[in-house]
């Protein structure tokens, strides 16, 4: 059984609307999601002793989510990740997007899907959010109807994304939750054991745009096919952290993507997805200045993201899996976050 409760989370400034919070609860998980950015604000998971802790980074109040912050828990779009120089050409026409990450456009632009109010609909086992992204929003062509559905099933949180376009446009939707399986507010993720089911990754240039090469993980820091303890692994390979797309094996059906185990608590997160890639990000840009839930500071490497996605900058790299959605087609992807103890 899943219970769904609805409450006011806060009011937007200047009478711009009321943000609601939806609490989904099963016998194993409790998830809070708000209608601002379809944002996961809390996710309580039991450890091997049966004690529940909140394992996602975020804020207690709406104000936290309205300030400049690194997409904690939000759905990002119209195109997640980076588009080089914020431009792409479609049917001979060049489109210019908002530049908001060095020379590039990141996560949909200045006012992406994470910074808008969505319309909620309560389901028996979850909540569905919808919105219409108008033609030209953040520079993207065509109107885009979008639905994001969160449902609970025991220890599994399922996120389904659907979209329909009035004209051809790139679409790439993901959730940007930062996890710490020791509990949010824990100082780092070095004691997490990580596995990612990928034989290849995308090397990036100095502004984190893929170079176009699809590189084998063999013999590199990116070989996470067997479990590695993150802290030791980063030290051993002298890397500052990960912020890279891993190219997932398998077909467009549900595929295993990643597993993270925190030995101290016993908590395990397994991720499955229909998407062709996952951005593994280790919170390299967190610096402890934002005050999170219960006053927690979030320093570098205090959370990790597994952003299931199409490959970054695919709209400019024709040999990457396609990201264009045409009128009459439906974008439809699902990601499963499965929690357990071991």
UniProtKB/Swiss-Prot annotation:
Where are the Phosphoserine residues found in this chain? Answer: 124
- The active site annotation covers 176 (proton donor), 307 (proton acceptor)
Q: Binding residues for beta-D-galactose, per the UniProt record?
A: 81-82, 107, 176-178, 243, 279, 307
Task: Print the keywords alphabetically.
Answer: Carbohydrate metabolism, Cytoplasm, Isomerase, Phosphoprotein
Q: Which reaction does it catalyse?
A: alpha-D-galactose = beta-D-galactose; alpha-D-glucose = beta-D-glucose
Q: Give the matching PANTHER family.
A: ALDOSE-1-EPIMERASE, GALACTOSE MUTAROTASE
Q: Tell me the protein family, please.
A: Belongs to the aldose epimerase family.
Please state what the protein is called. Answer: Galactose mutarotase
Look up and give the organism this protein is from.
Answer: Bos taurus (Bovine)
Annotated gene = GALM
């Amino acid at each position: 059984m899943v219970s769904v409760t609805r409450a006011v989370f806060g009011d937007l400034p200047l009478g711009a609307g009321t943000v609601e919070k939806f609490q989904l609860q099963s016998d194993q998980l409790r998830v809070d999601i708000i209608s601002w950015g379809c944002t996961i604000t809390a996710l309580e998971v039991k450890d091997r002793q049966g004690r529940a802790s909140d394992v996602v980074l975020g804020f207690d109040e709406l104000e936290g989510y309205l300030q400049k912050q690194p997409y904690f828990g939000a759905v990002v779009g119209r195109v997640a990740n980076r588009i080089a120089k914020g431009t792409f050409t479609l049917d001979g026409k060049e489109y210019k997007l908002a530049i908001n990450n060095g020379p590039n456009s990141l996560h949909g632009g200045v006012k992406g899907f994470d910074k808008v109010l969505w319309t909620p609909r309560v389901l028996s086992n979850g909540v569905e959010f919808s919105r219409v992204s108008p033609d030209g929003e953040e520079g993207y062509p065509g109107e885009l109807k979008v639905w994001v559905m969160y449902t609970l099933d025991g220890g599994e949180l399922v996120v389904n994304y659907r979209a329909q376009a009035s004209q051809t446009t790139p679409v790439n939707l993901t959730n940007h939750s930062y996890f710490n399986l020791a509990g949010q507010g824990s100082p780092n993720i070095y004691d997490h054991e990580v596995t990612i089911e990928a034989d290849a990754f995308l090397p990036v240039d100095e502004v984190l745009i893929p170079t176009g090469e699809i590189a084998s993980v063999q013999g590199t820091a990116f070989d996470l096919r067997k479990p590695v303890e993150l802290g030791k692994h980063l030290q051993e390979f002298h890397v500052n952290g990960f912020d890279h797309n891993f190219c997932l094996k398998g077909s467009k059906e549900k595929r295993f993507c990643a597993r993270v185990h925190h030995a101290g608590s016993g908590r395990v997160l397994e991720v499955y997805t229909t998407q062709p890639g996952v951005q593994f990000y280790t919170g390299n840009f967190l610096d402890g200045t934002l005050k999170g839930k219960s006053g927690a500071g979030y320093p570098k490497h205090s959370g990790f993201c597994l952003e299931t996605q199409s490959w970054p900058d695919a709209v400019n790299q024709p040999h990457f899996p396609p990201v264009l959605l045409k009128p009459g087609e439906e974008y439809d992807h699902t990601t499963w976050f499965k929690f357990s103890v071991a």
